[in-house]
Amino acid sequence: MKKIIPTNLFKLISILFILTPFFAWSAPQETLIDRVVAVVNDNIILKSELDAEVNLAKQDLQARNIPVTNPEELASKVLDKIILERLQLQRINQLGIKIADDELFSQIQEIAKQNNLTVIELRDRLNMSQKNGFESFRERIRQQMLFQKLREVEVLSKTQVTEDEVSNFIQRQALVQSDVEYHLGHIMVSLPESATPDQRDASKQKAQEILQKIRTGGDFSQMAVRYSEGSKALQGGDLGWLGIDQIPTFFNDALNQLEIGETSDVIRSPVGFHIIQLQGKRNKNSQIVKQYHLYRFILLSEDAQNKQQPSPTLVKLAESLNSLESFKQLNEKYSDIPASVNANGNLGWQTAKEMSPEYYQAIEALQPGHAAKPFATEKGWVILFLDGIRDQDLSLKDKRKQAMQTLRMKKANESYEIWLRRLKDEALIDIRLEDPEIMKKQPSHEEANAN
């Protein structure tokens, strides 16, 4: 599964607030009556939920040094984001999509690794930031993984790529700077699925007006927050660093004409009109990678993380494992452990970047044919066996496989916005953001504290 989670630790901590009550301060119970701001099919969205999401969006924009110039527009944009999330969750329930615990744990390991932390360190930091912070974080990550699976089922699985397209893609990649990454800003003005000529003209005119504001000194990020209907609008339109194979094909011609800091003309696509800004350009480090073939065995223990070191008996056991055959015999030695725990013990070939920090630390100085010193995880004690080390480059077969995956993802990205729009168009949505009927006025912090 493609990684979907932001790796900045501030974001990891700040998203916890989405899962906690907005009114955390003490106030008389009768003043805390909530109200409905939207109904999505048979699901309601409360004002407290919207307020929590708006606060999170403000924190993220503040971290990017993007001022909030229009709070009402921000709230409306955030509400639209929540509505899309609810629609996707409803579809997930209809399809019976689930996330297994081991999938979730692997994703959290990846997040910890990208923040140069172990899972234990990540857990401790989140719990220090908020009570039960790690558990709330786990559920948020589970939800984002569900969204990713839904996207794979509804969009990616239906995206077809021909062998000719793969061959042409590989040939084109040989002609372009495939080792270059681009940092892009993006603004989108969307079109209805069956847009009339008048609607197309109105959307194009709006995009032209936004572009004019940017070219006369308007800040691109602020324009994105205010006007963009793209998925990254609340991040100032920041698409991050992308390889040429990750950029929508309809951006290519415009991108080739841009210098750093320049903004494109309005670009037409099937989903609307776009403006991109080239905010950076850099070379990727291309090199032969070292891969490690690992096997893993987990000894279940509820208190492993509370102990500083494994027992001498356990260390001696690991030191005695000097062949893959002896390592595999652990399944017989510990037959009381459920088979499912170690069913996926062959981890295959992995690079250092693909491993969690604790895994690489355990095998970094290890010679092939030996087991690493046991270390503690959430599930218990882990013993890794290093079966081999190799230097690996992509073969032509691997390149075709990678090209196929890249093209499918590229096509899926181009059709994702259409699918989301259709999902929204088919739903019954009642927005009550401007409804003045609030049963009791929310007190200010000062009023609440005075009570």
Swiss-Prot record:
Its EC number is 5.2.1.8. Residues 1-26 form the signal peptide. Coiled coil: none annotated. Keywords: Chaperone, Isomerase, Periplasm, Repeat, Rotamase, Signal. Its main location: periplasm. Residues 179-280, 290-388 form the PpiC domain. GO terms for molecular function: peptide binding; peptidyl-prolyl cis-trans isomerase activity; unfolded protein binding. One of its GO terms (cellular component) is outer membrane-bounded periplasmic space. GO terms for biological process: Gram-negative-bacterium-type cell outer membrane assembly; protein folding; protein stabilization. It catalyses: [protein]-peptidylproline (omega=180) = [protein]-peptidylproline (omega=0). It holds the Pfam family SurA_N. The PPIase activity resides only in the second parvulin domain. The N-terminal region and the C-terminal tail are necessary and sufficient for the chaperone activity of SurA. The PPIase activity is dispensable for SurA to function as a chaperone. The N-terminal region and the C-terminal tail are also required for porin recognition. This is Chaperone SurA.
